Amino acid sequence: MLRRVFLSLALLAAAPLPALAQANAGQPAPAFTLTDLDGRKVALADLRGKFVVLEWTNPSCPFVQKHYGSGNMQSLQKRFTAEGVQWIVINSTAASHSEYLKPADQKAWLQKQGAAASVAALDADGSVGRTYGAKTTPHMYVIDPNGVLVYAGAIDDKRSANPADIKIANNYLLQAFGELRAGKPVSAPSTQAYGCTIKYGS
């Protein structure tokens, strides 16, 4: 009897733990409220009826620098916000990490880069990033006007930090929006994001 108990406990310990819930393309985008870099509340619910892009970032990451240093990210931000898309930049770096930036420093960096996002916010406790399953910087998400997540993954298909690769890359955001504007479903709703690991707190 005792042997069976120990065996059951061993099997239980070896069993994989249930994965944390993550946002999946084709499902409603998880609700969230963040505070932007100027101290104002930003709620996803308030953006219903509009396309929303979520961009996870970390200025210290070479992959983020690839897209900002080349002007690629700013170009995308300007293009989509001009079309009425709400673009939210989110930094989930933990406040205890050396790469954490205070709101004023994050704002100054974005201004220096000429960023054109609608909103920039910090997610220092990592709650929103974990809910969405954001793993890298950059990690991109597209939410449609009905609040459904229609794309989650990489910004493009060139998994390098080399800015020269941008010109030959297939940009998944441009592809997704091109299909959505044409009334078609997104052909690649999920891709594997690449970049630097998000520095979540413990």
Model-derived features: positions:
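N-terminal export leaders
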Residues: L2-L11
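Sec/Tat signal peptide C-region and signal peptidase I cleavage site
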Residues: A15-A21
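Structural microenvironment flanking redox-active thiols in thiol-disulfide oxidoreductases
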Residues: Q65-Q113, A124-T131
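Short active-site neighborhood of thiol/selenol oxidoreductases, capturing the structured segment around
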Residues: A45-Q65, F177
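A short beta-strand-turn-helix
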Residues: F32-V52
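Short, internal strand/loop/helix patches
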Residues: K107-V150
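Cleaved targeting-peptide boundary
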Residues: A21-A29
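Thiol-/selenol-based redox modules, centered on thioredoxin-like
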Residues: V142-S202
